[in-house]
Amino acid sequence: KRQGADSLREISDGLYSSLGKLSHLGATAVCRSTLSYANSKRPYKLYEDFYYVLLEKFRHEIQGRLGNKFTKPVFSLDSTTISLCLRLFEWAQHRRRKGGIKLHTLLNNDTSLPEVIVETTAKTSDIKGAKGILENIPPGSIVVMDRGYNDYSLFKRLTDKGVVFVTRLKDNAQHTPLRQGLIKADPDGCWGLYEMKFTGAKAKLHCSETNFRVVQWLDKETNRWFEFLTNSQELSATEVADLYKERWQIELFFKRIKQ
């Protein structure tokens, strides 16, 4: 059964109903207006510090769910929008009659806990938010992200940092294969892979010297083909497909925090 208070008035009423117990602590009840004033004046840094203390505590207490499934730490990168009342938060306007903030999140897939959350206005693009998270991604790890993060400068920065990424390839991405594709069938599905370079003008500014790999995967359950993009030359096609499935964990995380 859920316990707790839903409003400041409920908290205040609870304190006044426990005056006898409070007196033993040398404390008194606090009225609702005092609580409201304290909330409005209390700096956000207090809650930020408290959040990271709790995060560090649970990071060491929660047993990892991935075990030895992957040889490197796996993270998911994505964002979600939290709606706000535009009348109260005019600075958060992102549509004519709507307000909101965007949470750019790097999730640890082993613990299902966020490594870092960057808050911006909802107007901020996912790419810009992702670049603010880059310094928190450890070298030698794997980052899974959807194709909303198809950005050549982001690909280069991740590659230069020694971070492996797995994402969906955009349908209109200009590229040329470097090696003949390999097609194979296994119990989990049919797949093909080939090495490639991006050929678009914007891509040449950032990725002209980098070779990428495309994994084509047929999901037997849905009978759909998917094209995954990675900068790894070692991951197998099955591992790439399994890694992209891990991205679902961050969707579940967003669902939980919004409930």
How would you label these PLM feature ranges?
Residues 1-10, 14, 39-42, 49-53, ...:
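Single, function-defining residue in the core of a domain
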